[in-house]
């Protein structure tokens, strides 16, 4: 099965280890992974900030970059959600709406792809740690992917999972929200960090790098000894 990696900006610039882990997990599961070099930002930050024309230019470039892909897989629920929104955003342009629909139909968040396309729940991962899981807003509420990460994590040998209080509460990142509403964002992430502390977990696991960078940064500033891991890294642990 051929898979094209939609790496996302945050992974490309800040969390390259997540991209590497994603590729290694997919290849171990029998996928042939390529990286379309024409990919750029999905346009979400520009669109959410009101720069619709600029955002659509980026969207068209992304549609073209992945036009020949059999499947598109991303280690981000947020950016995958943006791809799924493309058809609606091009509804007044039939030509691009059709192309956008083709892309949306073949694009999957990593855990969704592994569980629902490959039909795998045990990837053979091993991690002897006590962990808690942060569920990101876009992935659960907009993309509708919530059970898939847990199905995979329950099969990780040695991993002790403990429930995160207020797990559906936003961490305060929200892309540009954390910049535009910094004081509110800080209060939200402080609440999230307090919840993580309550679990006494050694590891915080999540599926969106934005959330993990936000929570992880706050944990570091508070000198909390909690390791932050993307789920791709967990699934790639041996």
Curated annotation (Swiss-Prot):
Any one biological process term the GO annotation gives: lactate metabolic process
Recorded GO MF terms: oxidoreductase activity
InterPro entries in UniProt: Cys_rich_dom, LutA
GO cellular-component term (any): cytosol
Annotated function: Is involved in L-lactate degradation and allows cells to grow with lactate as the sole carbon source.
Family: Belongs to the LutA/YkgE family.
Protein name: Lactate utilization protein A
Organism: Bacillus velezensis (strain DSM 23117 / BGSC 10A6 / LMG 26770 / FZB42)
Gene name tied to this protein: lutA
């Amino acid at each position: 099965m051929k898979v094209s990696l939609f790496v996302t900006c945050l992974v490309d610039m800040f969390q390259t280890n997540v991209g590497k882990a994603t590729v290694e997990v997919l290849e171990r599961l029998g996928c042939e992974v390529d990286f379309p070099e024409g990919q750029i930002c999905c346009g979400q930050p520009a669109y959410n900030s009101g720069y619709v024309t600029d955002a659509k230019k980026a969207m068209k470039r992304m549609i073209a970059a992945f036009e020949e892909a059999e499947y598109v897989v991303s280690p981000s629920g947020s950016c995958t959600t943006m791809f799924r929104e493309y058809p609606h955003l091009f509804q007044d342009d039939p030509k691009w709406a059709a192309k956008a629909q083709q892309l949306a139909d073949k694009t999957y968040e990593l855990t969704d792809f592994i569980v629902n396309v490959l039909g795998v729940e045990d990837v053979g991962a091993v991690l002897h740690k006590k962990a808690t899981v942060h569920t990101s807003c876009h992935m659960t509420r907009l993309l509708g992917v919530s059970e898939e990460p847990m199905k995979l994590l329950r099969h990780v040998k040695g991993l002790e999972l403990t429930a995160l209080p207020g797990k559906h509460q936003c961490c305060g990142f929200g892309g540009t929200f954390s910049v535009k509403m910094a004081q509110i964002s800080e209060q939200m992430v402080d609440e999230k960090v307090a919840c993580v502390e309550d679990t006494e977990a050694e590891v915080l696991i999540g599926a969106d790098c934005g959330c993990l960078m936000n929570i992880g940064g706050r944990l570091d500033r508070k000198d909390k000894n909690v390791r932050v891991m993307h789920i791709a890294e967990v699934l790639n642990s041996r």
